[in-house]
Amino acid sequence: MAIFEVKHPLIQHKLGLMRKADQSTKQFRELASEVARLLTYEATKDLETESITITGWAGPVTVQQIKGKKITVVPILRAGLGMMNGVLDMIPSAKVSVVGLYRNEETLEPVAYYEKFASGMEERIALIIDPMLATGGSLLTTIEMLKKTGCRRIKGLFLVAVPEGLERIGRAHPDVEIYVASIDERLNEQGYILPGLGDAGDKIFGTK
């Protein structure tokens, strides 16, 4: 599995601001969107383009456009919604697919309660977005759901991740690419990433 830790200075600066314990909901939300925008730039560098001829101000001109069915953005509810606008700022024509998961309190594994995928998934590149990749359970379930639709090009965009989750995904789905702003140290006993961001969903939605 290809893992890209994007160490761009702007990303690292913005992520540092997000780690502040007293960061406001407004600022945290804006920063999540900004980092998502920068991660999208990195994750789409290999998109195929094709030449088309358009009418420019001085006559016909050949330009490049993205080839094929393009992209579907897949936020994992609810925290993934906090990154969606940042991705769509970069790819405004992208279709949005949605996955909703909850945790089974007995098995502690994610269970899908909602899914809505764009048409033609077998021809699309799926960008899964979620602020945190912790145990990898939610991502694993989402990847499996996407592959059942026929989607074969899948990438994940995360603000923070830990080695345990990355290793789990790598074993199960070595074909998936991961783009992450920071690979953090570890999970604590409660399953939170350290140093992490705290509960990113609560911070994005103001329910902390």
UniProtKB/Swiss-Prot annotation:
The keyword Transferase applies. Binds 1 Mg(2+) ion per subunit. The magnesium is bound as Mg-PRPP. Pathway: Pyrimidine metabolism; UMP biosynthesis via salvage pathway; UMP from uracil: step 1/1. Uracil binds at I193, G198, D199, A200. Allosterically activated by GTP. 5-phospho-alpha-D-ribose 1-diphosphate binds at R78, R103, D130, P131, M132, L133, A134, T135, G136, G137, S138, D199. Keywords: Allosteric enzyme, Glycosyltransferase, GTP-binding, Magnesium, Nucleotide-binding, Transferase. It holds the Pfam family UPRTase. GO terms for molecular function: GTP binding; magnesium ion binding; uracil phosphoribosyltransferase activity. Its cofactor is Mg(2+). One of its GO terms (biological process) is UMP salvage. It catalyses: UMP + diphosphate = 5-phospho-alpha-D-ribose 1-diphosphate + uracil. InterPro entries: PRibTrfase_dom (IPR000836), PRTase-like (IPR029057), Upp_B (IPR034332), UPRTase/APRTase (IPR050054), Ura_phspho_trans (IPR005765). Belongs to the UPRTase family. Catalyzes the conversion of uracil and 5-phospho-alpha-D-ribose 1-diphosphate (PRPP) to UMP and diphosphate. This is Uracil phosphoribosyltransferase. It comes from Pelobacter propionicus (strain DSM 2379 / NBRC 103807 / OttBd1).
